[in-house]
């Protein structure tokens, strides 16, 4: 049975004991977070259709080995996306090859903002999930939800717990 049918939705279930801890409210400590190495993404555009992948690959590898590379064909030109571990490699490549002419066409080399791209992808995912007319519905009204919710500190949570225990 397919999990992505229209009427059947599978959600990720978290155990109640894991869900209701202070750690889940305050967020994970910095030491426990998984660190993802930042990659610097370059976009090379306006590549002529007669320029081979190997020519562009040689230009890129002149400065260092890319972590990722992808070529795309468009109607009247081509583009290339490549990721580097080191920002220096990316900036050197931009300095040397931005507005560089290959086979009569001037290529453009730009550094892409990965954080903006991630935010845009998250927004698109939300739109797909909730559709053009909103979410799946809720028995809560919008006015019941706080407008801005900040994470409480451990001291604030302890004071709240003490006040609750004194009431009963």
From Swiss-Prot:
Q: Which intervals hold domain RRM?
A: 40-114
Instruction: Give the record's keywords alphabetically.
Output: DNA-binding, mRNA transport, Nucleus, RNA-binding, Transport
- State where it is primarily located: nucleus
A GO biological process held by the record: poly(A)+ mRNA export from nucleus
Q: List the disulfide bonds.
A: none
A Gene Ontology molecular-function term? RNA binding
- Look up the record and report any one GO term of the cellular component aspect: nucleus
Q: Name one Pfam family in it.
A: RRM_1
Question: What CDD domains does this protein's entry cite?
Answer: RRM_YRA2 (cd12295)
Show the stretches that span the lipid bilayer.
Answer: none
Q: Where in the cell is it found?
A: Nucleus
Q: Which PROSITE patterns match?
A: RRM
Q: Where is this region: Disordered?
A: 113-152
Q: Which InterPro entries match?
A: Nucleotide-bd_a/b_plait_sf, RBD_domain_sf, RRM_dom, Yra2_RRM
Assembly: Associates with mRNPs.
What family does the Swiss-Prot or TrEMBL record give for this protein?
Belongs to the YRA1 family.
What role is this protein assigned? Answer: Involved in export of poly(A) mRNAs from the nucleus. Recruited to the coding sequences as well as poly-A sites of active genes.
Q: Supply the name of the protein.
A: RNA annealing protein YRA2
User: What is the source species?
Assistant: Candida glabrata (strain ATCC 2001 / BCRC 20586 / JCM 3761 / NBRC 0622 / NRRL Y-65 / CBS 138) (Yeast)
């Amino acid at each position: 049975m397919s999990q992505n049918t229209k009427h059947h939705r599978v959600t990720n279930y978290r155990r109640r004991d894991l869900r209701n801890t202070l750690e889940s409210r305050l967020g994970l400590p910095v030491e426990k977070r998984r660190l993802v190495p930042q990659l610097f993404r370059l976009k090379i555009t306006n590549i002529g259709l007669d320029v081979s992948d190997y020519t562009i690959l040689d230009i890129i590898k002149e400065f260092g080995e890319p972590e990722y590379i992808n070529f795309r064909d468009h109607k009247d030109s081509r583009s290339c996306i490549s990721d580097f571990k080191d920002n220096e490699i990316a900036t050197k490549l931009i300095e040397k090859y931005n507005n560089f002419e290959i086979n009569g066409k001037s290529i453009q080399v730009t550094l892409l903002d990965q954080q903006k791209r991630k935010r845009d992808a998250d927004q698109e995912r939300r739109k797909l999930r909730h559709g053009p007319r909103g979410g799946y519905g809720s028995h809560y009204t919008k006015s019941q939800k706080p407008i801005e919710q900040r994470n409480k500190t451990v001291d604030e949570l302890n004071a709240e717990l003490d006040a609750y225990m004194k009431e009963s």
